[in-house]
């Protein structure tokens, strides 16, 4: 089994494109994404046919990170990990700052650095040398240059990089607008929007041409290090007592264009614990699947499907009836929004949603930066866990009776900022935070046993 990590020198360097090309070029790839992003893993699945897992040094301790990596590579030939932001960018300026470099050291994985070569010559060697010297425990084994106008220029830049840094160049990406993907909140389209499309077919052809003509695939594969994939799900002590614990129970997972943000490790944990996962679409289906013990609404883009969600009256009624019958319901971000009364859009349109939580949400034209990023969470049950927030909306009207329904989450960021959020009503829990179950298994057990 081989492993390699693709990082950018900075955001926008081209690491997602390079990762996608390499995932398309090699066979039977186990894809991974550093950090909490949901969109890139969807692309990984498009180009590999395999599920992608998030590797997050903030949400996971080192043993958990290694566990998710080792279980995620089972049966594959090569693990390709896509980084996040720039190689050393994380929280603060310590080297253990939950960055791509931090993850690479935990996993002892070689790094290929993608560098934007636009408008630069010999100075690119100084840039690469700085990355090499900044942390000698990060194994930068190769460089791929992006935005290169010609092979002649690439060879010129390659000479400078290799002469002054001792790190070999492994190829380049030519300037080509067709390599880019349109923006959508987190920076990309959702992968399902491209599935079976002509755009995807053309992109795969282009990726193949670039891989064959511009990248040294043989050397990249040689640089990727061998490692042992010992240990399965049931050998990880924090979850060993969960094996088949909930066998016979059924969880409905909302899955469509409006709700698609799920950590694959969360779903793996559900399957390991014996839960039967049944997917359904609040956009298309007329009612919930039968005999559910838990309904899981992940994040996504309900604002793009507000009309379909609003007009699907029978689905909303089915969800309200499940709530009245005591079925456990858990919602994150977009899923939380769907469980509220109404979503108000910027253009004046609105969607009437489930209304279980007597709250109105309003979209904003910019990121809610005050409540953005990694968060430490303490629940009303004194369970401490971790997650993140990322949303372009906010609560505009809150008619919930606070005497009966205090906020369930106490949030604190590493910089000391804090707030409360989340709504707990009967057997429903929902709020803006996206939560990794592996951050604290007790939270996962709470959803199944005590909610």
Residue ranges, per PLM feature:
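A short helix->loop->beta-strand "cap" motif at the edges of active sites that frequently abuts
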Residues: 109, 167, 324-328
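Cysteine-nucleophile active-site neighborhood
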Residues: 302-378
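Residues that mark the start of a beta-strand
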Residues: 3, 28, 248-250, 276, ...
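C-terminal and late-domain segments of enzyme folds
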Residues: 217, 244-247, 259-269, 362-451
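Internal gly/pro-rich beta-alpha loop/helix module
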Residues: 121-242
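Structural motif
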Residues: 5, 80-82, 112-114, 144, ...
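ATP-dependent carboxylate-amine ligase catalytic core
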Residues: 2-13, 17, 24-107, 115-141, ...
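Phosphate-binding active sites in nucleotide-utilizing proteins
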Residues: 240-324
